[in-house]
Amino acid sequence: MYQKFRAYGFLKNLRFFDPFLVLFFREMGLSFLQIGALFSIREICINLLEIPTGVVADAYGRRKAMLASFSSYLLSFALFYLFPRFSIYVLAMVLFAFGETFRSGTHKAMIFEHLRIKGIEHLKVEYYGHTRAASQLGSALAALIAAGLVFYTGSYRIVFLASIVPYILELFLMASYPKELDGELVTVEGSWRRKLVGRIVTTGGEFLKMFRRPQLLRGLFNGSSFDAVFKSTKDYLQPILQSQALALPVLLSFGADQRVAVVVGVLYFLIYLATSYGASNASRMQEKARSLPSAVNLTYLFGVALLFVAGLSTWKGVHALSIAAFFGFYFLQNVRRPMIVGYLSDLIPQRTMATGLSVESQLRTLLMAVIAPVIGLLADWGGVGMALVFVALGAAFIFPFLRVRGGKTEPDEIL
C-alpha cells in the first residue's frame, strides 16, 4: 500500500492549472475581487459539505467517497475548459468543492487505518510525509508540463483539459484499494433513511466531543488558520512572477504569455522540488525541535514572517525578494503539514479519523471563505503587496490564541 499511497499523492497533484490559476482568470477578464469571490464560493460550498461528507466516508466507506471525489473533479475541469464565463465558473467551483469535501481527510484516514492494521502507527509522520513528498513531485512535474502546454498553445485554458487525464487514472487507483481501508462502519437497522440519520447522529456526536477539549480545539484552529492563510495567498505568487518575467531581458523574441509560461513553470518546478524534500524530511526536522507542539508553533510564526516579507517586498517593488519569501513559505507549509496532522492524529479517535480531520478542514475553508474576497478587494484597491501584508499581520495577531501546548492526550480519553 505504501507505493499506492505515493501514487495517489503523485497523480492527485498533477493539477496542471495550479501554477496558472490566477493568470487564467485574469486572462478571462476577471478582477481580483471576482477571483476572490470564486475562491470564497468554493470554500463556502466546502464548508457546508465538509462534515456531512466526512461522516458519510466514516459510515459508508472511504473508497466510495474517494471515487465520488474524483468524478466531481473531472466534471469541474471540463466546465472550466469548455465554458469561459464567470457564471459557469461558479458552477465549476461548486463541483470542485464536492471533490474536495469527499477527498478531504478521507485519504489521510485510510493511511492511518493501514498503519493501525499493520501495527506501525508510530510511522504516521513518515508515511504521510512521504505521501506528501510524492504529491509535491507531481506538482513539480505538472508545472513543467503546464508551462510547455501554455508555451505551445499561447493560452492558459489548455491546462484544465490536460488535468483530466491523471484524474481518470486516480479513479482506477481508488477502485484498487482494499476494502479493509474503509475503516469501522457503524451499522444501524431500518430503512436507508433511518440508517443515514442514525449513522450521522452516531458518528457526528463523536466529533462534537472534540470541541470539549481545549487542547484539541487549539490544535484544530492552529492547523486550519495557518492553512487558510497559505491557501488564500499562495496563488498571488503568479502575478508577481508575471511582473518579474516581463521585466527580465530574456526570451524577448517570444510573446508575453510564452515568456511568463517559461518563468512560472521553471520556478514552480523548483518550488515543488523543494517542498517535496521538505515534506519527506518533516520527521527529521520535527526531531530537531524540542517537541511536536514546539515545532508546530515555531513553523506558524516563521511562516507568518515570510508572508509579511513577501507582501512588503511586493509593495515596494522588490519582486526577487518577494519570490524568495514565497519560496520559503511554500517549503515551510509542506514541512509543517505532516507535523500538524501527526499532532491531531494523537488526539482524534481512530474510528472517526476522517471526520476529525474533516472538522479541521472545515474550519480552514470557513476562514478562507472570509479571507479570499478580502484579499481580492485589497489587491484591486491597493495592490497585491498591501493585501499580503494585512493578512500576515492578522495571522500574527491571533497566534497567542492558537498556540498549542505539550502533553499527549490519548484518543481513548476523548471518547
Report the location of each language-model feature:
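Substrate-agnostic recognition of the 12-TM MFS/MFS-like secondary transporter fold
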Residues: 4-23, 35-57, 61-73, 88, ...
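Short amphipathic helix-loop junctions that connect adjacent transmembrane helices
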Residues: 19-34, 235-261
